[in-house]
Amino acid sequence: MTNKKFVNALGKIPQSVPPIWFMRQAGRYHSHYQNLKTKNTFVELCKSPSLAAETALGPIESFDFDVAILFSDILFPLESLGMGLTYSPGPKFDQLLTEENSHEIFNNTFDVNSLAFQGEALER
């Protein structure tokens, strides 16, 4: 599903109308998101590639935006670094990031496959 306006913008090709997308476009206001949320947790929507893709594409279909934004959470890489992320209802870490432990946490290696669900969602 290639969008010409977006591809042209990436190629710096002049056009009469720029591509349109919004951050958090699959938000709480959107009925498509609300319907998915009644059957799935936030984490399920993010970590299931098919659900993440469906969530991201909802606003494209409803509002005719030009570009979809990956439906995910910015905190998942920190979870992969061993910080123990849970949602109840909002995000909570098992350990806090401090000046004292930041060097150790950010120098941890992690299996990049722990974030494979994000790449799989993009492929859909």
Regions found by a protein language model. Name each.
Residues 1-80, 84:
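N-terminal basic, low-complexity leaders that serve as flexible interaction/assembly modules and, when applicable
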Residues 90-124:
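A gly/proline- and charged-residue-enriched helix-loop-helix capping module
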